[in-house]
Amino acid sequence: MEASVAPPALRNAPCAGVNAACLSAADDAVAIAIAQETTRQRESIELIASENFVSKAVLEAQGSVLTNKYAEGYPQRRYYGGCANVDRVEDLAIARLNQLFGSTYANVQPHSGSQANQAVFLALLAPGDTILGLDLKAGGHLTHGAPVNISGRWFTAVSYGVDPRTHLIDMEQMADLARRHRPKLLIAGGSAYPRLLDFARFRQIADEVGAILMVDMAHFAGLVAGGVYPSPVPFADVITSTTHKTLRGPRGGFVLTNDAAIAKKINSAVFPGLQGGPLMHIIAAKAVAFGEALDPSFKIYARRVVENCRVLAQTLLDGGLAITSGGTDCHLAVVDLRPLGVTGTIAEQALESIGITLNKNAIPNDPEKPMVTSGIRVGSAAGTSRGFGPEEYRRIAALILETLHAVRAGTLEADREGIRTRVRSLVAGFPLPY
């Protein structure tokens, strides 16, 4: 007979009543895993561009009793009673979000950025309609028409790419594709594109072919809020985003628009079209994060994020690696490892072993398989939240280069602990608040 996997505090618990024990007493297995992850975050350098460190206030909201509340529907139009308090929270989130981005309508219920995108598709498209988005191989996102994603299965997906020499979006190619395919939806945005997007040009092309313009600003929303990245709000028909990444909130999504008719369709697509009850504890955490982003200090944070990423990218470039597009205008950079003859997978694993976390990433027109890649993606949002500045990012770049050279020379096993010690020393001066 298999041993019980039930938490110790529950194996002999009475069959009634809510367990009042704290997590460590109620479920040591989960508590240990969380404690170990806390240690990992404290002692490691986080360079994953889609990750960040939330405030204690955001964590507190996420862990509140709002997790107990069902609230299908929208404020003042719920299908359950007892919603006055969660209505107030959702109204706050909506008002703060619109204030933050200068939009008129907002839906804060999507559980993720992917579901925010799906809500737009459900609201504004029919199966088989044509969508035009950035190719995944050029830095796009799965939900913008990749064949393995529902967006590439339910719709006729056409992809535009980047110039093979500059790695910048080929706007003329995109315009030509738009004229030939007449997409119902034109998508701007991606997950590994390090340069500014020309929203005015996207708008011009969308108008020329009669397309709806959607901007997915999941990666750069916090930079828009901080005033260091152009806002898509004056140009796009509809905007989607996550609430984490550069916005430094809980994991979730939202949709913005200035069009009342689109807003009504989006609301119906989110509920009841895609989701049932919203996660009110997450919406509370979103409200907290939006409030934090409205503080003037957030503009300083956003400016430092971009400055730090440019320093990181330039130092890696000076150290002999290649940077796609030659640099960055935002919080992320894509590093081409081919000058060192190291794959993205090997680099990711080697760097994690010394305490630097990032992800393997395809470079434009990558000859390697998606699970191997020729590159890595680095980001500065999380480290900047810890307080890292340009000097720390120069040191981080040096640690990356030292590790990759050790991999190439076959000396990482001997060098690992010394490099790991220097990583711990660096982060010790910038403790997390939890």
UniProtKB/Swiss-Prot annotation:
UniProt GO MF annotations: glycine hydroxymethyltransferase activity; pyridoxal phosphate binding
Output this protein's name: Serine hydroxymethyltransferase 1
Which SUPFAM superfamilies did the record assign? PLP-dependent transferases
Q: Cellular location of this protein?
A: Cytoplasm
User: Which Pfam families does the protein's record reference?
Assistant: SHMT (PF00464)
Q: Tell me the residue numbers annotated for binding (6S)-5,6,7,8-tetrahydrofolate.
A: 136, 140-142
Oligomeric state and interaction partners are given as:
Homodimer.
Give all N6-(pyridoxal phosphate)lysine modified positions: 245
Q: Gene encoding it?
A: glyA1
Under CDD domains, the record lists: SHMT
Print the keywords alphabetically.
Amino-acid biosynthesis, Cytoplasm, One-carbon metabolism, Pyridoxal phosphate, Transferase
Q: Name one GO biological process term.
A: glycine biosynthetic process from serine
Enzyme class, one word? transferase
Keyword Amino-acid biosynthesis on this protein?
yes
Which pathway is recorded for this entry? Answer: One-carbon metabolism; tetrahydrofolate interconversion; Amino-acid biosynthesis; glycine biosynthesis; glycine from L-serine: step 1/1
User: Taxonomically, what lineage is the organism?
Assistant: Bacteria, Pseudomonadati, Pseudomonadota, Alphaproteobacteria, Rhodospirillales
Q: Which organism is it from?
A: Rhodospirillum rubrum (strain ATCC 11170 / ATH 1.1.1 / DSM 467 / LMG 4362 / NCIMB 8255 / S1)
Function, as annotated? Catalyzes the reversible interconversion of serine and glycine with tetrahydrofolate (THF) serving as the one-carbon carrier. This reaction serves as the major source of one-carbon groups required for the biosynthesis of purines, thymidylate, methionine, and other important biomolecules. Also exhibits THF-independent aldolase activity toward beta-hydroxyamino acids, producing glycine and aldehydes, via a retro-aldol mechanism.
Kindly list the residues the record flags as site (Plays an important role in substrate specificity). 244
